[in-house]
Design a protein with these regions (language model features):
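RecA-like P-loop NTPase motor core of helicase/translocase proteins
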Residues: 1-244
């Protein structure tokens, strides 16, 4: 059974506002070295080269862009970029539950890639049930977006503490990569994501992810980044920017 998807005007407005944040950005490669500490030196493919996002516009330009988007949408201009977290630029996109938020943020991801070349995205959700629902939504819209974006291919990765090669692939692949994780997977020092791991030659999964400077999308933020510990955990992802 095929499902027909239609983009509604308010969804387009939300996508356009998010994309406008980076106006002036040009497509730039951002490669980094993934150190292989294994004696055999066989853990990493492609000579241990990681691929990430690189924002080149400065804070002043970004704030001008944000103010432009706010004025276009009848919102009072902000005087800073940081919202409830001072560690990285963060922006609120207000949409009610049931209005197609997952559809909107996937379309936003693809627009950010099309216009600016961004490749790495992390979606943080409050629970396993929501994580599975988000993954299902992302899967069933793949064909629709493939047609909308000239055959675009993107990789979906649900963080699994038992399959840490996913974190390595996320950091090293030169493709659009979308990781979906719960906040509980990385908000404590004892979490697998925050521990040195032999599967990754002694590296911590979160360090590989942070090297990519992902754009972070926080789903149901009232239940995700509502504590200081959660905010610190998200900051440890080293985001280029966040949408919530």
């Amino acid at each position: 059974m095929k499902i027909k998807f239609d983009t509604l005007d308010y969804q387009t407005e939300a996508v356009n506002a998010a994309v406008l944040v980076f106006e002036g950005q040009t497509i730039k490669d951002s490669n980094f070295t993934i150190a292989d500490a294994s004696p055999q030196g066989t853990l990493f493919a492609d000579d241990g080269i990681g691929v990430g996002n690189r924002v080149i516009i400065n804070s002043e330009q970004m704030l001008k862009n944000v103010n432009k988007a706010q004025i276009l949408n009848g919102i009072a201009p902000s005087d800073n970029l940081f919202g409830n977290n001072d560690n990285f630029p963060q922006f609120n996109i207000d949409m009610e539950t049931g209005t197609g938020k997952t559809f909107v943020y996937l379309k936003t991801i693809l627009e950010l890639n099309k216009k600016y070349g961004f490749l790495k995205f992390v979606i943080v959700v409050p629970s396993v049930a929501i994580k599975e629902g988000v993954m299902k939504s992302l899967e069933i819209t793949k064909d629709y977006f493939k047609n909308q974006y000239s055959g675009v291919v993107y990789d979906l990765f649900m963080f699994d503490s038992a399959k840490l090669n996913g974190a390595l692939s996320f950091a090293s692949a030169n493709t659009i990569d979308i990781m979906v994780t719960t906040i509980q997977a990385f908000n404590k020092d004892t979490n697998v994501m925050n521990r040195d791991n032999e599967q990754l030659s002694g590296a911590r999964p979160i360090d590989l992810i942070a090297e990519t400077h992902p754009i972070v999308i926080i789903d149901e933020p009232q239940s995700v980044d509502n504590t200081d510990g959660a905010k610190e955990a998200i900051s440890n992802l080293n985001p280029s920017a966040g949408f919530r």
